[in-house]
A protein has these predicted regions:
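A charged, low-hydrophobicity C-terminal interaction/regulatory region common to genome-maintenance complexes
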Residues: 1-89
Length: 89
């Protein structure tokens, strides 16, 4: 085909965690939208959301949202350096 080959995008939770951890080191409070600023694909958005849920569950962040379809705000409550790999890939 003249359009070339379409590659399947693989985004693992571990890879996304590395990105989010780095972001958390620089920002103590931010919106979910800010995590997606790098032109995220649908798969990347889903994986980012799953990592955020895992970080909530482990107590490293708190999340608040005023209402349905409102912005999601994230506050870092733990030390990002202490976050270990997510093995749920």
């Amino acid at each position: 085909s003249k359009f070339g080959k379409i590659e399947k995008e693989e985004v693992t939770m571990s890879e996304k965690l590395v990105d989010i951890k780095a972001f958390m080191m620089e920002h103590k409070s931010f919106s979910f939208r800010e995590l997606l600023m790098k032109g995220a694909s649908k798969v990347s958005v889903i994986v980012t959301f799953l990592v955020v849920l895992e970080l909530m569950k482990t107590g490293f962040i708190t999340v608040k949202q005023e209402g349905t379809c409102e912005e999601i705000y994230i506050d870092v409550t733990g030390n990002p350096e202490m976050i270990e790999d997510i093995s749920a890939d």
